[in-house]
Amino acid sequence: MASKIEILKANLEAALGARVVSLTEAIGELTLVVKASDYLEVAKTLRDDPKLCFEQLIDLCGVDYQTYGDGAYDGPRFAAVSQLLSVTNNWRLRLRVFAPDDDLPIVASLVDIWTSANWYEREAFDLYGLVFEGHPDLRRILTDYGFIGHPFRKDFPVSGYVEMRYDPEEKRVVYQPVTIEPREITPRVIREDRYGGLKH
């Protein structure tokens, strides 16, 4: 008798055919990778095909692969990764799509297929700069209105570009260039025999 994962894998291959770029299994989970041009059509099939029946999108996030594998990775930089759930069949699927353009990463929005994608896509836009084409309200959701850049990108500086502080003279919050100076921290070496109650 075939396992649930084997049944799901066979159903996905039968329903999607050549639209499957890759379908891999790791630690009991399936990951389906599709091209950006097939993304919406595949998502509709995943939801509507009675042998698949993924009724819920339970998570969506962006991923920046710029330094993946210690910089040895040579594929597209940005991906949108969705976690799908079929309550009917009691199985899950990870759906990954890579944005074809690294300079302006655009993929289709899944809001019309799963409404739960709304805020997840806004979060991926805000933090990674992924543009979800067809999203009804694609604006920042976590960072401030005037925030510059996308803080989860691998090339975003750790200290950021600007800092925010309250100015008592202006009686409002103001932005100014970052004033954090890089420093080197030297670890303190404690050479006590009984430090912290430990016996040596």
UniProtKB/Swiss-Prot annotation:
InterPro entries: NADH_DH_suC (IPR010218), NADH_quin_OxRdtase_su_C/D-like (IPR037232), NADH_UbQ_OxRdtase_30kDa_su (IPR001268), NADH_UbQ_OxRdtase_CS (IPR020396)
The UniProt record lists the keyword Translocase: yes
Localization in the cell: Cell inner membrane
Main location class: membrane
Entries under Pfam families matching the protein: Complex1_30kDa
Gene3D superfamilies membership: NADH:ubiquinone oxidoreductase, 30kDa subunit
Record family assignment: Belongs to the complex I 30 kDa subunit family.
Function description: NDH-1 shuttles electrons from NADH, via FMN and iron-sulfur (Fe-S) centers, to quinones in the respiratory chain. The immediate electron acceptor for the enzyme in this species is believed to be ubiquinone. Couples the redox reaction to proton translocation (for every two electrons transferred, four hydrogen ions are translocated across the cytoplasmic membrane), and thus conserves the redox energy in a proton gradient.
Protein name stated in the entry: NADH-quinone oxidoreductase subunit C
Gene name for this UniProt entry: nuoC
